[in-house]
């Protein structure tokens, strides 16, 4: 039971003492939890007890610092009706589904999937006594592939119903991002050809053994077998999709997996309907290995994005913007050398023929390398707007004063809500709240592509108090500002970090958990306009700002 560890056994009452060292200001009240494991007869019970203790000379809790719900905010009745509705549902799932579909098309070109198309279609054609039967079986097979990938998202819906912020917490978890970094490095080494990733053979064998069952059941297990045996190629692509959509919630995840499954399923269904098309398919060969190795370089670059996410939310300072861009430039150089046959990887050989398509890809990779190089410098050309959101922000730089950063709004940003509210009253300006995240791609795109536009930048500076609240900041709050909070839904959560506080503040008051989210309040903490999310259209965003400012003026 205790893994042979020595234990002390006590009966009846027991007093436990523990020395506690507090580096922060000492609070007037100390709250904590004790996890216990006790025996009563033959029954063993584990439980968690909370306690509180008064500390002499401690600092009293600042109630304003623990305020979450703004009673003055009515999400259904803003002062002016511009922007999105307060109960807006993100329609970005269509974009995610399209990206998932593209990921599925890429997966089709891998050595694990592509050769299966003619083999599977031929199997259905020969097995069925009529052409109609072959078409039916092929379509059912494709449908099962689609449903298998969609079904993979069901657990995430169950998790999301318990805590809506769970997806944002997952996507911004420092240690989870480090795990993904290691996994994607592992995937990329595999794609380079140094070893093969496979699921346990027993899983594939068990699914394959069921494929001989009656018509529908057999076809389902054939589809399941394909999903399992192709994992070594589809796994990295699926992993990118899962992580990329995690912060958008369960429905975006479902949309992405649906797009992926649809792309994989369509060829099997279409070739079953039109078997003559098989003759136009290119034959399997070395080009499939080339596709896999090109994907390896992409996976390697993506791995450092995950490490960067962890670095940003924890403020480790490991991957400053220039270091990150430099690593991507090295990966791009490696891809260039590979495409021209200068860099040889496992299964390549001296003198092998380099196709025109591979050479053209090498040219693209070389041009991309040239594009990245200014990103390492301290010049106005270092913005890399095409990649906005992927490298760390310009503020996270090796250079103390970055020239490219001067175009934006960063010097005017406040990160303290109470300070912003005081300035709003003092200057008679509305507060523009920017719910953002260190690991938020779309937040960086808005900051680097929209806020840097002179018209937008000057309008915000002149008319708003700009407040940026980071919902994924893992820095711990002073101990006097940590507390337990019961949400409006009745769930209890611990507010320990800066991110905990502002993520809860956003969800409770504005009923949304995605970033970026822009909210305008007046100095009475009333909602002026409907909040808006990611708005890359400069004219549309500026129009919303002007409408919000007019609403503040006319109130």
Say what each PLM segment does.
Residues 450-456, 486-554:
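Non-catalytic, surface beta->alpha helical segment in thiol-disulfide oxidoreductase systems
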Residues 105-106, 426-444:
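Short active-site neighborhood of thiol/selenol oxidoreductases, capturing the structured segment around
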Residues 36-49, 112-116, 230-237, 435-448, ...:
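Short, thiol/selenol-centered motifs that function as redox-active sites or metal-ligating centers
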Residues 1-90, 382:
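Extracellular/lumen-exposed scaffold segments
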Residues 68-420, 427, 452, 469:
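Hydrophobic alpha-helical segments characteristic of multipass inner/organellar membrane proteins
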Residues 427-431, 462-467, 513-516, 523-526:
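Loop/turn elements at helix/coil->beta-strand transitions in domains of secreted/extracellular proteins
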Residues 262, 296, 435, 440, ...:
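Hydrophobic, well-ordered secondary-structure elements that form the walls
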Residues 409-414, 436-438, 447-500:
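Thiol-based oxidoreductase modules, predominantly thioredoxin-like and allied folds used
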